[in-house]
A protein has these predicted regions:
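Cytosolic ends of transmembrane helices, especially the final helix of ABC transmembrane type-1 domains
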Residues: 4-32
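Active-site-proximal flexible loops/turns
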Residues: 21, 66, 227
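ABC-type nucleotide-binding domain
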Residues: 34, 41-42, 48-215, 219-220
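A short, hydrophobic C-terminal helix/tail in secreted or cell-surface proteins
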Residues: 221-227
Length: 227
């Protein structure tokens, strides 16, 4: 009789603990979702309708802490169709410059202009819709290979995903995976190597086919045969 009571009670206690953990986790998640970004669209911000001429960095100054500048008076321009590489030592501000274009941060002085208009005059949604970012730290989800690549373009077909993977030199290792494109890669892509994760990130960017592609120093994690 006693054992018949203790078993369901123990089960109830275990489930109650799980519920409390779930509530605590939910509160943290919603606090992040509800957080307001410091960077907001200005009143009357306009839509970016594609890159027609050039991106101009005009006397850019930037500081993370408001005091020591990590970028001091940088000026250059990138014309439509050009590929520009920023080369320099670690900590030199290359990634920071890349993060200023989609307004992950705002410049402290100077300006970034797209077709003669400050990026701060465009809506963030329209600005980022014309961009892709292959970051140093690849963001992948506990989903299939195809599902992760497909996040680059809503409604992408399987053929489009395969072609993007081929261009990113990812198709070769995907074909060798246990279930091909339907292989689950685990949380944050834990089942893949660093180079494979970054090739999926590149494939996602290729699938989006943006007018303004931005790529950080992603080759550092590539295997030799993929370089």
């Amino acid at each position: 009789m006693f054992s018949q009571i203790t078993r369901p009670v123990r089960t109830f206690i275990d489930q109650f603990s799980n519920i409390n953990q779930g509530i605590a986790a939910g509160e943290r998640i919603f606090s992040i979702i509800d957080a307001q970004s410091e960077i907001q669209d200005k009143p009357g911000a306009i839509e970016l309708d594609g890159l027609k001429d050039k991106i101009e960095f005009r006397d850019i100054h930037f500081s993370y802490d408001g005091s020591r500048e990590v970028i001091e008076g940088i000026s250059f321009e990138i014309k439509r169709g050009e590929t520009v590489a920023l080369v320099g030592p670690s900590g030199g501000g290359k990634s920071t410059l890349s993060e200023l274009i989609p307004r992950f941060y705002d410049v402290k002085a100077g300006d970034i202009l797209i077709d003669g208009v400050s990026v701060r005059d465009y809506t963030q949604d329209s600005l980022r819709a014309h961009m892709s970012v292959v970051a140093q730290d690849t963001v992948l989800f506990n989903d299939t290979i195809e599902g992760n690549i497909a996040m680059g373009k809503a409604g992408a077909t399987h053929d489009e995903i395969v072609e993007a993977a081929r261009i990113a030199n990812a198709d070769c290792f995907i074909q060798e995976a246990p279930e091909g494109y339907q292989t689950n890669i685990g949380d944050r892509g834990v089942k893949l190597s660093g180079g494979q994760r970054q090739r999926l990130s590149i494939a996602r960017a290729v699938l989006k086919n943006p007018e303004i592609p931005v790529s950080y120093t992603h080759l550092r994690a590539h295997e030799t045969e993929a370089d």
